[in-house]
Amino acid sequence: KDAGIQPMADVVLNHKAAADGLEEFEVVEVDPMDRNKVLTEPFTIQGWTKFTFDGRNGAYNDFHWHWYHFTGTDYDASRNKNGIYQIQGDNKGWAHGDLVDKENGNYDYLMYADIDFKHPEVVENLDQWAEWFIETTGVEGFRLDAVKHIDSFFMKNFIHNITKKYGEDFYVFGEFWNGDTETNDEYLESIDYLYDLIDVALHQNLFRASQEGENFDLRTIFDGTLALNHPEEAVTFVDNHDTQRGQALESTIEEWFKPAAYALILLREAGLPCVFFGDYYGIEGKFAQESFQEVLDRLLWVRKDLAYGEETDYFDDPNCIGWTRSGSEESAPIACLISNNQAATKVMEIGSSYAGLTYYDVLENCSETVQVQEDGTAEFPVAERSVSVWVAQDTEGQ
């Protein structure tokens, strides 16, 4: 905080693992591909659902978790058998189908012991935990993991209580891993737009663009995205821990396109961009990836100091798109250009008041300079399968 950084916590509310003991309870086994399809009559299993936290010795509270605080689990210790087991009992069952993702019929269950957000003791305990956690750690925001698996009615009330107590500046966004436009619209409505969502559709578009190269129409890069449809609620990203190579949702943006992808999230008005640790510092091991620190530092500098003002798009060619930002009282306009095919140029307007001003590519992908003409336009180049970010030559700070 002393450095001007707002600390946030990555909060996993969906499930609990590493229980302290086994319990017996009644379940039915369901089809993994359709969790609404029951495969068995009710029977008894032994599951890891007893959480007593003996090592804490009651230091924080005396709440213990038991089988009736969960909706399901994935392992029967008595038979040494894996499966998806829906816990039976009063007011049990998955969350209502309209409150969770509809993949696999009902995607309430993800893994381990799945928390039952309908249970009043669970709701009370999590509200108390949130207050304790925020005041103990001093965090000023939450990243909510796996929200498409969590009852959205609970999430709306949970976050409402937090922001009511700690203010609207307590920033919250959710990992809602679904790229469908209508589904995102419905989810945002269901939570009353109380928190933002990661822009999965944009990531998927960036991935396709990197895979398809010149066959991808760059004019469609924002189609169906939160950045386009809900710019104030979009958390934009290029890659993350789930999409990197070797992970469950592997869809890594090809290296040749990553600088362009980051320009698209860092230098535009829409969305709150997030830079992936692995892209900045690189990744080692079996699925190694180079570091993009140098190009990211330059893009981040442009974002921080120069990427202000009205945005004008030049999305007029399937293989070459550009945009300008009109600048501020302290900074001249900037221009960005992306090509997924051959080298190209595009005439874009900077403003007649900047006539004679010389521009250079801060990414150094183009070595020449460009001068703004008397009419306020300039013809900016971009190299083959590349990105260029053009800034005024007398700009300080880089």
Feature roles, as predicted:
Residues 65, 95-136, 147:
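Active-site-adjacent "subsite" loops/lids of carbohydrate-active enzymes
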Residues 88-111, 252-260, 386-388:
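Solvent-exposed, charged interface segments at domain starts and junctions
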Residues 85, 116-120, 176-180:
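Short N-terminal helix-initiation segments at or just after the protein's N-terminus
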Residues 29-106:
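Core domains of carbohydrate- and sulfate-ester-processing enzymes
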Residues 1-9, 14-15, 24-64, 128-398:
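Active-site-proximal helices and loops of the catalytic beta/alpha 8
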Residues 72-83, 101-111, 207-217, 246-250:
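Short charge-dense sequence patches
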